[in-house]
Amino acid sequence: MDLLLLEKTLLALFIAATIAVTISKLRGKRFKLPPGPIPVPIFGYWLQVGDDLNHRNLTDYAKRFGEIFLLRMGQRNLVVVSSPELAKEVLHTQCVEFGSRTRNVVFDIFTGKGQDMVFTVYGEHWRKMRRIMTVPFFTNKVVQQYRYGWESEAESVVNDVKNNAEASVGGIVIRKRLQLMMYNIMYRIMFDRRFESEEDPLFVKLKALNGERSRLAQSFEYNYGDFIPILRPFLKGYLKVCKEVKDRRLQLFKDYFVDERKKLESTKSTTSNDGLKCAIDHILDAQKKGEINDDNVLYIVENINVAAIETTLWSIEWGIAELVNHQDIQNKVREEMDRVLGPGHQVTEPDLHKLPYLQAVIKETLRLRMAIPLLVPHMNLHDPKLNGFDIPAESKILVNAWWLPNNPAHWKKPEEFRPERFLEEESHVEANGNDFRYLPFGVGRRSCPGIILALPILGITIGRLVQNVELLPPPGQSKIDTSEKGGQFSLHILKHSTIVAKPRSF
């Protein structure tokens, strides 16, 4: 009897919703919408598409429907653009119109409904947060202030690998050590602190919470409840876990880092030995002036833990994997550094501009294995036109940035890992968005400001490793597995492979 009642209730809801949608369409504004599959009432195209909206699946739809298409996912409009011309329109020409961020039930939890910078809507709060975060994080002065620390952390990785006897025989999962390096690089900038080892209890706790946050946020498991509000009650358990993880992370940031820095400030100078403040000092200054509140401070820390640490780590891991699988390219990188810098001279940040082949390897890694292949989703607040089509207000706009430089119509043999392309036919292309066929960091007002940190960190880390060790697949294998794992808008390697690292002798 209960089952029969449930079936009748669901059927009644379905019929009522169908009627409501039909009436709304008859009475509402008539749009010329982008092409796409025909949706069914309530569910839209969700039943056919499913939850996994990764960059490769969306590329397949672009091949069917064109450079702009619309997926009606439940009650959400999802517009995907897949050409350089339309990417320019969204990110540059109409950057104000498309400059907001879409809401999401899970990201609302992790960002306090947009109290951060990355996921807030376009407006005064975003401008304020961007300004407050730029000085302590995203300027050349920051690069010059902290580059010695980055070089020291990379040197520490090299020494640990060289001193690990197993590394040169059976191999090690080098990603674990690189993860510690990335945390130390960013926590030096944020708090003038570092973790001594992978076993540091605070590091273990922090890494676990950040990992759980990433898993929950990047999963496609919750899409159905985000797309179809009447199904949201089924997400109750998932959202409860998200809130618990969010609360534990923010409490950890507050207790162990922000409050500790405040205590130091009350007892002694918080400037470093060279008289320069770390990032949290600048942010707390803004808080004292009343520009931001306590929660904003914590959500800034939240953004850096995710946006800066994870994405750069993924790119380093991808770069190493490609060099392991392309020994000829690895040898060319090594030969260039030996020739230009001299054998044994460890690469530094000022050296990077002298090493065009190393730079080309980094660009090629970001092209083929883009860490954020769909960029961070955009949203329009009104009803603009795009390529002659009407885009309904509050649509989720995805730029398939991965497809732009992997489309054979625009790039020569894009499926190949070939750094030479950036020294030959694509020598003018940079990672800063000067060519709309290649946007690893986006472009325009909502582009990733972390480019100024990511590129030198990638160059120093990959350069130091290649200089000092031969990176090889494990015994019995000719290559390592580079299968992808895509998330809501992330792309990282599926399996953290074991890599043999044989020390070089100079």
UniProtKB/Swiss-Prot annotation:
The keyword Hydrolase does not apply. Pathway: Phenylpropanoid metabolism; trans-4-coumarate biosynthesis; trans-4-coumarate from trans-cinnamate: step 1/1. One of its GO terms (biological process) is lignin metabolic process. It catalyses: (E)-cinnamate + reduced [NADPH--hemoprotein reductase] + O2 = (E)-4-coumarate + oxidized [NADPH--hemoprotein reductase] + H2O + H(+). Induction: By fungal elicitor. Keywords: Heme, Iron, Membrane, Metal-binding, Monooxygenase, Oxidoreductase, Transmembrane, Transmembrane helix. Disulfide bonds: none annotated. It is a single-pass membrane protein. GO terms for cellular component: membrane. Its EC number is 1.14.14.91. Heme binds at residue 448. Coiled coil: none annotated. It comes from the Eukaryota. (E)-cinnamate binds at residues 213-218, 307. The chain crosses the membrane at residues 3-23. It is found in: Membrane. Its cofactor is heme. It is an enzyme of class 1 (oxidoreductase). Catalyzes the first oxidative step of the phenylpropanoid pathway in higher plants by transforming trans-cinnamate into p-coumarate. The compounds formed by this pathway are essential components for lignification, pollination, and defense against ultraviolet light, predators and pathogens. Belongs to the cytochrome P450 family. This is Trans-cinnamate 4-monooxygenase. The lineage of its organism: Eukaryota, Viridiplantae, Streptophyta, Embryophyta, Tracheophyta. The gene is CYP73A3.
